[in-house]
Amino acid sequence: LIYYPDMGNQQREHVSYGLPWNPDQAERIAQMVEGLELVLKLWDASEPVTFAGRYYQASEAVCRPLTVQRPHPPIWFGEAHPDTLAACARYGQGWHSTPVSLPVLAQRLGALQQACRAVGRSAGDIQKAMATQILVAEDRETVRRRYQQIYGLAETEDIPDSLNPAWLIGTPDEVEGKIRAYVEAGIGHFLLWFIDAPREEGLRLFADEVAPRFR
């Protein structure tokens, strides 16, 4: 189990759950961090917890059963807001990025390193992950054809140059090369969205031809 606190970026998500929407991002992060502090106290407590915060209050609260993972499940944070990185440096065991180019990733990892340094912690203690989209096929022509089918392109259209550079689009060798570049930059885990799902050819090809190269 991984615990992933989040500030919530979508107003519609708050509304759908009957929660008030606060457009102030910094305040949403502060609320997230305070909620995490309360959760950690409850997970660690042998006695009832009383908590008086700005956003949350609890009186003689008890959380049972306690977590199986001790002292608690690993805590992961996402995105690159300075306040979120500060919280990750203080509480996190992992940090997760959206799909970004290598230069942008370097900036984000540098900011995380600075946040860790500010609290006397090594950024090497924090695992790093990135989510990205993937389309892998045996040859470049098949990659192009499947991309056209997925996004409704004409047969004469090619994969656009403006494609997100973090997307893993290509043959097994090309996808391996892109993954290695991000691994060398510091990413240790990948959350992969196979854009040709529910077809299984790409998933199976990745499992058979690409994943074993990283074992």
Regions flagged by a language model, labelled:
Residues 1-215:
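Active-site-adjacent structural elements that line small-molecule/cofactor binding pockets in enzymes
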